Amino acid sequence: PKFKSKKNPVRSYTTNCVNGNITLQNAKLELPKAGWIRIKQHRSIDDRYILKGATVSQEADDKYYVSLLYAAEEPEHEIRPVKTAIGLDFSMSELYVDSNGAHADYPHFFRKSQEKLAREQRRLSHCEKGSSRYMKQKKKIARLHAHIVRQRKDYLHKESRKIANFYDLVCIESLNMKEMSQDSRFGTSVHDNGWGMFTDFLSYKLECAGKKLVRIDKWYPSSKICSCCGKLKKELKLEDRIYRCTCGNQMNRDENAAINICREGLRISGVELDTERKIS
């Protein structure tokens, strides 16, 4: 099969499995008309699953990927009793701060590569559009972007796995990431840290383990409520990074919000906890 689009950076086609015309065997894949091709298999497939189709895609960096669609009976996940819970407050600079005071310390893969990307973009601007040199430079930039995406996904998978292993209930805010990404002040940070992707990973990992992700209302004033006395502080500017209350409470603004998010999530779930567990 041939890809039809010349402009779309991600080109793909999908084919259905009919009469066994798609076969996966010993790190080799048989596709209609393409025959047998060698692949790097991401993970092993359970023999009970039924192969339904395949989607072959060519990314902007010229690498080919195939996604296989399988059908299987959805397993019943045993709901585990909640013994441990944590609240996560979204942070522009660190991905999140949790209710135990721990910071994710997100590596900022895109920002670290910005200088190199800008240099390669300048070189591209000096090439004649459509020339072989132009296409070669364009692919080089695409490879850089693909590398950043892989770094980000790897980090977010590991971070979400760590949390899913330790906690039975995870509480977060329902944020409109699309709206935030369009803000000139936050756009780059929102795209860089991948909070939406992180929460998606966290959601399915928790579900598979019989655990739960609770999203609290985005209008809940988690940053303005004192986590010690419960008093609402009406005047709180975005640049105020330390939360100070008349009761004497003084702590990191995001940590204070994370504690409130955790408590609100527990309230919504109807769960009471006497113990806490921290990630070691």
Q: Over which residues does each language-model region extend?
A:
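Nucleic-acid substrate recognition interfaces
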Residues: 1-280
